[in-house]
Design a protein with these regions (language model features):
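ATP/NTP phosphate-donor binding region
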Residues: 1-86
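Glycine/threonine-rich beta-strand-loop-alpha-helix active-site module
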Residues: 69-119
Length: 119
C-alpha cells in the first residue's frame, strides 16, 4: 500500500545544505532572514551559517534560542524580527517549535533545520 505525505512543502537533505540557506530564502521570495538557533548550533556552526548569507549578500539576524518554547520566548523573538520576512529555526524540537510559532503569529514563512533525528 502506498502512502503519500503532503507536508512539508519541500524537504531537502544533504551534505553542505547549511551553506545554501540564503539561496533557499531567496527561492521563498524573502529579502531578510531571522535565524533562531540553539546555543550549541551557534557555537559550532555560526561561521558556516553566516558564510551562506555573506556570499549571497543576503540580510539576516541571528539570535540564540532561550531554551524553552514559551509565550514569553515567542513574543521576544516576534519583537526582534524587525524587517525580517522569513524565520529560520535551526536546532532541536523546542527551537523549531518556537521558530514555527514566531512564523505563524507573524504571518511569514518558516524554514526549519532539524539537528536531531527525533525532529
Amino acid at each position: 500500500m502506498s502512502k503519500v505525505i503532503c507536508s512539508p512543502g519541500c524537504y531537502i537533505q544533504g551534505n553542505g545544505e547549511l551553506k545554501k540557506l540564503a539561496e533557499y530564502c531567496a527561492m521563498a521570495g524573502a529579502k531578510k532572514a531571522y535565524l533562531l538557533v540553539d546555543k550549541f548550533i551557534y557555537d559550532t556552526y555560526k561561521s558556516e551559517i553566516e558564510s551562506s548569507f555573506k556570499t549571497d549578500c543576503f540580510k539576516y539576524t541571528m539570535e540564540i534560542f532561550g531554551g524553552e518554547c514559551s509565550e514569553h520566548e515567542i513574543h521576544k523573538h516576534q519583537n526582534a524580527l524587525g524587517q525580517s520576512d522569513i524565520v529560520i529555526g535551526i536546532g532541536g524540537g523546542k527551537t523549531l517549535d518556537t521558530a514555527k510559532a514566531v512564523s505563524f503569529y507573524s504571518n511569514i514563512p518558516v524554514i526549519i533545520v532539524p539537528t536531531a533525528a527525533s525532529t
